[in-house]
From Swiss-Prot:
Its EC number is 2.7.7.8. It is an enzyme of class 2 (transferase). Involved in mRNA degradation. Catalyzes the phosphorolysis of single-stranded polyribonucleotides processively in the 3'- to 5'-direction. SMART domains: KH, S1. This is Polyribonucleotide nucleotidyltransferase. It comes from Synechococcus elongatus (strain ATCC 33912 / PCC 7942 / FACHB-805). InterPro entries: ExoRNase_PH_dom1, ExoRNase_PH_dom2, ExoRNase_PH_dom2_sf, KH_dom, KH_dom_type_1, KH_dom_type_1_sf, NA-bd_OB-fold, PNPase. Keywords: Cytoplasm, Magnesium, Metal-binding, Nucleotidyltransferase, RNA-binding, Transferase. It catalyses: RNA(n+1) + phosphate = RNA(n) + a ribonucleoside 5'-diphosphate. The gene is pnp.
Length: 716
């Protein structure tokens, strides 16, 4: 491929494209950059493998720490497994890319995006999405592109294209819109309870910007002399399709119109219809074309039967407005919500069920030291709210090996996490680190939105003072030409056989998260707006059902949740509290059993299983860091005796010395004649010397000062 450098002005910034310089053996590659952020994207195609009946597409996003001038942590000092945010970026690239490949394509495809340089103003993810489209087009892979993506932020009342990290943090919206000439193909968003109208306007605003990038790609192809030929499906032999349609259409229609069937009953009934077709094929002569096709391609019959089922289900919805379970298009499945089902050792739990989808969410409260440390290129280095999603095989009635979380689990967990973030209390209001785990116990569609609802229940049961409860619903779509139907609360078969999976989460005030995926080449804004607006009454209905189980967060935390107290000290006193080599802070921890976390700002969080231990540690630290002035009177305890005086702990962790001459108004020959270790004594600060040592006295203390000191002790 010839080398080409191109720069285009996009919304006040330059986007630079470098083609042909890097990765010469890849099918197509581009270095796409903006500011100091540069992403190399390479797309490669290889010959199809035998027996493949799907598109083997792999999309990988890789981060290198050198991109930010850093060396990786860990013993090996080398990048290992991709961090969670890199996995989410891989999904972000994959989701708008995958639907644009022809359904018949079976070649191995791989798209690899590697961030080579990064600054803290330009996020690399949307550059990688657009770069993936360019690399695929340049590689001349059959592709219904171009496709591009932008990020939309909302700061004040103004929408911003491709905001910086700081603008994203300050704003009320973080929206990624991907589109093609045919329409919007992917949406991913987190929002601060924005009204539906604002979100729709933001998607429209983003799609308009996407059009500029699409035109730039078309211009680039013309400059390179690459003619984009829209692929056509190879000629198919319809012999098997016609046979299956003739033998199975009536049976499949009867099953789809048997609205009282459960999922397992419907699946079993469809299997019976399919089995009758298998028997009919087996009765054919060996030389019959239908039998020859099924013998040559073992998966052909199953795929053809699925295609027929899909067609008939879609026709039923478009024609009659009725779904396979008898629901209306905008009807939500039966809902059940419960809290506190698990023993009290669990800090909070919620069980949410919608139809046959059941999710158990468990909330755990931790200390600031439990926050997740993030070692990637993103400016944020810590997470204090974590949501983890698990979906074991038994949730769909299957058996398979248990694996570590994959991309799907990570993606669903992140979506539910994003949905709750806007309603969580601030660190100052609620200093706990919060982890919610959602266990999908049964799955029949929309488990991620079930996790949103379960998370809300678990957080409220745990006593987390969330600002508003959050619910979510998954919307589907059946579209044929200009005719379409939007489906509320899709179940598994509708997700599998439909054109769209659009997840909408939010409160009664507005939207907190969106995720839209397509199986077609794009949608006009009107259909997207219909889906968002149709989701609102569904969300509110679900929310009201959830509030029947628990209306407000519990007033008290679990008995087994740690007790946290926060105090502020002078940052210059951090070293005093920690002590040489951590000696002092370890001593406090050993004495009290409390855990102590100190931030650079001087914010100290003290936590323990019981409040008394935490309060004891708090008292010690406050005593150590309290400003002491001459003339202050304290009630103390003798800790040591030496020939020239006695040491007294007059504040927790704070000692001073009474010289023998200051023990009494008369001459004292031996300290032991007046004091013993453990004695309670009233002392006054006589002076603080240049080395910070506190000199105490028992002389000249008024009775009123003694009373005030005792009152202070009782109050603490």
């Amino acid at each position: 491929m010839p080398q080409l450098s191109k720069s285009l002005s996009f919304d006040g910034r330059d986007i630079r494209l470098e083609l042909g310089l890097f990765a010469p053996q890849a099918g197509g590659s581009v270095l796409i950059s903006s500011g100091d952020t540069a992403v190399l994207v390479a797309a490669t195609r290889s010959t199809a493998r035998e027996g493949i009946d799907f598109l083997p597409l792999t999309v990988d996003y890789e981060e290198r720490m050198y991109a930010a001038g850093r060396i990786p942590g860990g013993f090996l000092r080398r990048e290992g497994r991709p961090p969670e945010r890199a996995t989410l970026t891989s999904r972000l690239i994959d989701r708008p890319l995958r639907p644009l490949f022809p359904s018949w394509l079976r070649d191995d495809l791989q798209v690899v995006a590697t961030t080579l340089s990064m600054d803290e103003t330009v996020p690399p993810d949307v550059l990688a999405v657009t770069g993936a489209s360019i690399a695929t087009l340049v590689a001349k892979i059959p592709f219904y592109g171009p496709m591009a993506a932008v990020r939309v932020g909302l700061v004040g009342d103004d929408f911003i294209i491709n905001p910086t990290y700081r603008e994203i943090e300050k704003g009320d919206l973080d929206l990624v819109v991907a589109g093609t000439p045919a329409g919007v193909i992917m949406v991913e968003a987190g929002a601060n309870q924005l009204p539906e109208a604002d979100v729709i306007e933001a998607i429209d605003f983003g799609y308009e910007a996407v059009q500029e990038l699409i035109k730039a790609q078309q211009s680039l192809l013309a400059e390179l002399g690459i003619e984009q030929i829209l692929p056509e499906a190879p000629n198919a032999d319809n012999t098997l399709e016609n046979f299956v349609r003739d033998r199975a259409s009536s049976g499949v229609q009867q099953v789809l119109q048997h609205f009282s069937f459960t999922k397992s009953e419907r699946d079993a009934a469809l299997d019976e219809v399919k089995a009758s077709v298998v028997e009919a094929i087996a009765a054919l002569p060996e030389e019959d074309p239908v039998r020859s096709v099924t013998a040559a391609e073992p998966k052909a019959l199953g795929n053809t039967f699925k295609a027929l089922t899909k067609t008939l289900m879609r026709q039923q919805i478009l024609r009659d407005g009725v779904r396979v379970d008898g629901r209306k298009l905008d009807q939500v499945r039966p809902i059940s919500s419960q809290v506190g089902l698990l023993p009290p050792r669990v800090h909070g739990s919620g069980l949410f069920q919608r139809g046959l989808t059941q999710v158990l969410s468990i909330a755990t409260l931790g200390t600031p030291g439990d926050a997740q440390e993030l070692d990637d290129l993103h400016p944020d280095t810590q997470k204090r709210y974590l949501h983890h999603y698990n979906m074991p095989p038994y949730s769909v009635g299957e058996t398979r090996p248990m694996r570590s979380p994959g991309r799907r689990e990570i993606g669903h967990g992140a979506l539910a996490e994003r949905a709750l973030l806007p309603v969580l209390p601030s660190k100052e209001e609620f200093p706990y680190v919060i982890r919610v785990v959602s266990e999908v116990l049964s799955s029949n569609g929309s488990t991620s939105m079930g996790s949103v609802c379960g998370s809300t229940l678990a957080l409220m049961d745990a006593g987390v003072p969330i600002k508003k409860p959050v619910s979510g619903a998954a919307m589907g779509l059946i579209r044929e030409g200009d005719e379409y139907r939007v489906l509320t609360d899709i179940q598994g078969i509708e997700d599998f056989l439909g054109d769209m999976d659009f997840k909408v989460a939010g409160t009664d005030q507005g939207i907190t998260a969106l995720q839209m995926d397509m199986k077609i080449h794009g949608l006009p804004l009107e259909i997207i707006a219909d889906a968002i607006n149709q989701a609102k009454p569904a969300r509110l209905h679900i929310l009201n059902k959830m509030l029947e189980a628990i209306a407000t967060p519990r007033a008290d935390l679990s008995t087994y949740a740690p007790r946290l107290f926060r105090i502020q000290i002078n940052p210059e006193q951090i070293g005093l509290v920690i002590g040489p080599g951590g000696k002092t802070i370890r001593s406090i921890t050993e004495q009290t059993g409390a855990k102590i976390d100190i931030e650079d700002t001087g914010a100290v969080t003290i936590s323990a299983v019981d409040a008394d231990s935490a309060l004891r540690a708090k008292s010690i630290i406050e005593g150590m860091t309290r400003t002491i002035t001459a003339g202050d009177v304290y009630i103390g305890k003798v800790t040591r005796i030496i020939p020239i005086g006695a040491f007294v702990e007059f504040l927790p962790g704070k000692e001073g010395m009474i010289h023998i001459s200051q023990i009494a108004d008369y001459r004292v020959a031996r300290v032991e004649d007046e004091l013993t270790v453990g004695d309670e004594v009233v002392v006054k600060v006589r002076e603080i010397d240049q080395k910070g040592r506190v000199n105490l006295t028992r002389k000249g203390i008024d009775p009123e000062e003694v009373s005030a000191a005792r009152a202070a002790v009782e109050a603490s």
